[in-house]
C-alpha cells in the first residue's frame, strides 16, 4: 500500500513482512531515495494491513488504525518527527474511521465501547486530549452506519436494530439534526408487526480466561420449554466479521 505526499516529493508506503507480524510505514524521498521509517506495528501473532489512511494538516500528519495497545484505535502520526499520538483511548475497538472535520478539529469513527454487537458514531479531537463523545442519538440502540460528505457537515445515516427495518435519513453534523427522512420503511414495519414473532434471546458464552463471546438464539413462535426441539448451531470463528448484531 502506498500513497504520494501532498507535495509529490515523497512516497509513503507500508512494508509488511512475510510472517505478517511486522508492518513498517516508510517515507521515501523521490529526489534522493532517502528512506525514513515513520511507524512500526509489531505483534507476536498477526498484524493486519491498514486500508484506512487519512491525511490531515495539509499532509503533515496522517491518521492510522493500530492494535498496538491490544485494542484497535486511531493514532495521529507526524511525517516530520514520527511522533505517534493516541486519539481514542479506552478498552474498545474502533471499527473504522468515518470522516475527518479539520475545521472542528475532530475525527468521526464507528465503535461501540459498551456493547460490541452494536455500532454507533463517535468523534474524538485531533489534538490528542482524549476527549471522545457519542454522536449517534442515545435513544436509538442498534446499528448505525454513515456515509459522510467530504467536509463531514452532512451524512446519510442508516439506523436499524433487530426487528426494525433500516431507516435512512439525511442528517447535519455535528448536532446530528435530521434534515430529511429518505426511507422510513413504514410499510415493511407494518407488515412485520402483523406476523407472529419468534422469541429471540441475546446472551454471552464464557470460553475461559475471562473471555465471553456474544451469541443469540431464535426459538419457534409456539416454543414450549417442556419439549425437546432440533437445534441448529451456526458458529463463525474468524475475525473478519460479526454474526451477532
Regions found by a protein language model. Give the residues of each.
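Extended, hydrophobic alpha-helical segments in both membrane/secreted and soluble proteins
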Residues: 8-11, 21, 34, 49-55, ...
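WD40/WD-repeat beta-propeller blade-loop signature
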Residues: 7, 93, 142, 211-212
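Thioester-forming pentapeptide GCGEQ
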Residues: 1-3, 7
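Serine-hydrolase catalytic core recognition
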Residues: 14, 136-137, 144-245
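Beta-strand C-termini and the immediately following turn/loop, strongest in propeller blades
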Residues: 4, 12-19, 26-29, 55-69, ...
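A detector of repeated loop/turn-to-beta-strand junctions in beta-rich toroidal repeat architectures
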Residues: 22-25, 71-73, 118-120, 165-167, ...
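Multi-bladed beta-propeller domains
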Residues: 1, 28-52, 77-101, 111-114, ...
